[in-house]
Amino acid sequence: MENFLQQLKTLSSAEDFMQYFGVPFDQKVMNISRLHILKRFFQYLRQETPLAQTDELQMFTAYRALLTKAYGDFVTSTPAQEKVFKVFQDTDGKQHVTLDSLRASMPQRAAAA
Protein backbone atom coordinates (compact mmCIF):
# COMPACT_ATOMS: atom_id res chain seq x y z
CA MET A 1 0.00 0.00 0.00
CA GLU A 2 2.90 2.34 0.73
CA ASN A 3 4.08 1.93 -2.86
CA PHE A 4 0.66 2.97 -4.19
CA LEU A 5 0.57 6.08 -2.01
CA GLN A 6 4.12 7.02 -3.02
CA GLN A 7 3.17 6.73 -6.69
CA LEU A 8 0.16 8.98 -6.14
CA LYS A 9 2.42 11.64 -4.64
CA THR A 10 4.33 11.86 -7.93
CA LEU A 11 1.22 12.77 -9.94
CA SER A 12 0.91 16.49 -10.55
CA SER A 13 -1.75 17.10 -13.21
CA ALA A 14 -5.23 15.86 -13.96
CA GLU A 15 -3.85 14.18 -17.06
CA ASP A 16 -1.25 12.40 -14.89
CA PHE A 17 -4.04 11.00 -12.72
CA MET A 18 -6.11 9.93 -15.73
CA GLN A 19 -3.14 8.19 -17.35
CA TYR A 20 -2.01 6.52 -14.12
CA PHE A 21 -5.46 5.05 -13.50
CA GLY A 22 -5.99 4.20 -17.16
CA VAL A 23 -9.08 6.37 -17.53
CA PRO A 24 -9.65 7.40 -21.16
CA PHE A 25 -10.31 11.12 -21.55
CA ASP A 26 -11.04 13.80 -24.11
CA GLN A 27 -8.40 16.54 -23.99
CA LYS A 28 -11.07 19.17 -24.74
CA VAL A 29 -12.92 18.22 -21.56
CA MET A 30 -9.65 18.28 -19.61
CA ASN A 31 -8.71 21.71 -20.98
CA ILE A 32 -11.93 23.17 -19.60
CA SER A 33 -12.48 21.15 -16.43
CA ARG A 34 -9.18 19.70 -15.18
CA LEU A 35 -9.20 21.43 -11.80
CA HIS A 36 -12.89 20.77 -11.34
CA ILE A 37 -12.41 17.07 -12.08
CA LEU A 38 -9.61 16.74 -9.52
CA LYS A 39 -11.57 18.68 -6.90
CA ARG A 40 -14.63 16.44 -7.44
CA PHE A 41 -12.40 13.35 -7.32
CA PHE A 42 -11.04 14.39 -3.93
CA GLN A 43 -14.58 15.18 -2.73
CA TYR A 44 -15.62 11.65 -3.69
CA LEU A 45 -12.57 10.24 -1.89
CA ARG A 46 -13.53 12.06 1.31
CA GLN A 47 -17.07 10.65 1.11
CA GLU A 48 -15.88 7.06 0.85
CA THR A 49 -15.36 4.75 3.79
CA PRO A 50 -11.71 4.62 4.82
CA LEU A 51 -9.86 3.12 1.87
CA ALA A 52 -6.49 3.00 3.63
CA GLN A 53 -7.41 -0.29 5.29
CA THR A 54 -7.69 -2.16 1.98
CA ASP A 55 -4.91 -3.61 -0.17
CA GLU A 56 -3.30 -1.77 -3.09
CA LEU A 57 -5.38 -3.44 -5.80
CA GLN A 58 -8.63 -2.62 -4.01
CA MET A 59 -7.48 0.96 -3.45
CA PHE A 60 -6.42 1.33 -7.09
CA THR A 61 -9.77 -0.03 -8.27
CA ALA A 62 -11.75 2.22 -5.92
CA TYR A 63 -9.72 5.32 -6.81
CA ARG A 64 -10.08 4.56 -10.52
CA ALA A 65 -13.86 4.23 -10.19
CA LEU A 66 -14.10 7.54 -8.33
CA LEU A 67 -11.89 9.35 -10.84
CA THR A 68 -13.96 7.94 -13.70
CA LYS A 69 -17.12 9.14 -11.94
CA ALA A 70 -15.64 12.63 -11.39
CA TYR A 71 -14.57 12.87 -15.03
CA GLY A 72 -18.02 11.71 -16.16
CA ASP A 73 -19.64 14.54 -14.21
CA PHE A 74 -17.93 17.04 -16.49
CA VAL A 75 -18.40 15.18 -19.76
CA THR A 76 -22.15 15.74 -19.52
CA SER A 77 -22.15 19.00 -17.55
CA THR A 78 -20.19 22.22 -17.11
CA PRO A 79 -18.13 23.51 -14.20
CA ALA A 80 -20.72 26.24 -13.59
CA GLN A 81 -23.51 23.66 -13.39
CA GLU A 82 -21.56 21.31 -11.12
CA LYS A 83 -20.58 24.12 -8.70
CA VAL A 84 -17.49 22.42 -7.34
CA PHE A 85 -15.74 25.65 -6.38
CA LYS A 86 -17.05 28.23 -3.93
CA VAL A 87 -17.22 31.00 -6.52
CA PHE A 88 -19.90 29.06 -8.40
CA GLN A 89 -21.77 28.17 -5.21
CA ASP A 90 -21.97 31.75 -3.92
CA THR A 91 -23.10 33.47 -7.09
CA ASP A 92 -25.33 30.75 -8.53
CA GLY A 93 -23.40 31.30 -11.76
CA LYS A 94 -24.33 34.98 -11.97
CA GLN A 95 -22.24 38.04 -11.38
CA HIS A 96 -23.65 41.40 -10.43
CA VAL A 97 -21.57 44.56 -10.34
CA THR A 98 -23.31 47.91 -10.12
CA LEU A 99 -22.08 50.98 -11.94
CA ASP A 100 -21.90 52.78 -8.61
CA SER A 101 -19.47 50.20 -7.26
CA LEU A 102 -17.35 50.53 -10.41
CA ARG A 103 -17.32 54.32 -10.15
CA ALA A 104 -16.41 54.12 -6.48
CA SER A 105 -13.45 51.88 -7.25
CA MET A 106 -12.03 54.11 -10.00
CA PRO A 107 -10.59 56.92 -7.82
CA GLN A 108 -9.10 54.37 -5.44
CA ARG A 109 -7.30 52.65 -8.28
CA ALA A 110 -6.00 55.96 -9.67
CA ALA A 111 -4.73 57.02 -6.26
CA ALA A 112 -3.05 53.66 -5.73
CA ALA A 113 -1.13 53.86 -9.00
From Swiss-Prot:
Transmembrane segments: none
Pfam hit, one: NifW
Keywords recorded for this protein, A-Z: Nitrogen fixation
GO biological process: nitrogen fixation
RNA-binding listed as a keyword: no
Record-linked InterPro entries: NifW
Protein role: May protect the nitrogenase Fe-Mo protein from oxidative damage.
Subunit and partners: Homotrimer; associates with NifD.
Family, as annotated: Belongs to the NifW family.
Descriptive protein name: Nitrogenase-stabilizing/protective protein NifW
Protein source organism: Polaromonas naphthalenivorans (strain CJ2)
Taxonomic lineage: Bacteria, Pseudomonadati, Pseudomonadota, Betaproteobacteria, Burkholderiales
Gene name linked to the record: nifW
